[in-house]
A protein has these predicted regions:
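Acidic, polar-rich N-terminal leader regions of halophilic archaeal proteins
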Residues: 2-155
């Protein structure tokens, strides 16, 4: 007789282990796609490219975000994606309380003494090393033009 004896215990054990392995592989597959960093970068570029002060928001489907002057990174359980900005550099407004306030709508004159002080804070923010931070809402982009300072804040 040619073939595997189906009544052998080791055949049943092997089939059982293979079934458990397949279920385990299926359970670890991501249930959602990786976040779309390109769409977020497009929102930033649209705001940065305009000639007038503007504000834009983009919903995020990520758990963590990393914003740099020239790139954005998003990650969730399904993976990590990155995208470069076409218009930059932009100013990550995550480490400075004053820049975050202006990003969220405060007039720049309420947080900074002059346009030069705003530009200095922007330069300092762009020098920092981007870090992964938890996402706590939509991506906000605000282009501010005030007293000779032209800066695009992202947070």
């Amino acid at each position: 007789m040619i073939g595997v004896p189906v009544d052998a215990w080791h055949v049943w054990l092997g089939l059982s282990l293979a079934s458990v392995a397949l279920v385990g592989v299926g359970a670890t597959l991501p249930t959602a796609p990786p976040p779309a960093a390109g769409d977020a970068a497009d929102t930033v570029d649209r705001a940065a490219a305009t000639a007038h002060p503007t504000t834009a928001e983009h919903p995020l489907d990520a758990r963590s975000i990393r914003i740099g002057p020239r790139r954005i990174g998003l990650r969730n359980d399904a993976g990590t994606t990155h995208a470069a900005f076409a218009f930059g550099p932009v100013t990550p407004a995550v480490a400075s309380r004053e820049l975050r306030a202006v990003l969220r709508g405060a007039p720049p004159e309420s947080r900074f003494a002059s346009g030069e002080a705003l530009c200095d804070a922007g330069r300092e923010a762009r020098r920092g090393t981007p870090k992964w931070r938890p996402v706590d809402g939509p991506l906000i982009v605000r282009r501010v033009v005030w007293e000779g300072c032209d800066v695009t804040l992202v947070g």
